[in-house]
Amino acid sequence: MRIGVLALQGAFVEHISKLRKLGVDNIELRQRKDICENLDGLILPGGESTAMRKLLIELDLLEPLKAMIAEGMPVFGTCAGMILLAKEISDGDSPCFGTLDITVKRNAYGRQLSSFRCKDRFLDKEIEMPFIRAPYAERVDKTVTILAEHDNKIVAVRQDNQLAAAFHPELTDDMTVYEYFLDLIEKRSLM
């Protein structure tokens, strides 16, 4: 199994560390030539979504990655990655990939100083959830499965091959969300 990690900005190093601990081969995606045919999945890390969107366009990564996601490549977006995947952004910003049928509210939990950690349920397991200038989903399509909520706000979802979390599982010791993503990849490879 080989997973590409978008490595333009944000918490990509932490995602790579998690993948290594799980024994998963990975490649940093920094430019178009880094995209290879033998990728089984993609991670879009947290960071600053506007800067990431700009770099995706400038480096000619947006369209090929969007096509891969549309063709069924499993993708996992955290925080800014959730915003990049969202079909709609409630503050009027243009969507980036626009492949995940949700509406997100950017910086919904306030500024950097308002960042926090909590424990909440991801599916049937309580896990630590670090929120850093995090979004949440205000609306989800009926085809979207809600995987986690915090204070009645939707903070993790799945739609087909797409997984998104408003929090940063890469900043904890828990592997639950990564194991869920790897399971998603394995099930897809059996199809």
Language model features with spans:
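N-terminal beta1-alpha1 cap of cysteine-dependent amidohydrolase-like domains
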Residues: 1-58, 63-68, 175-179, 183-191
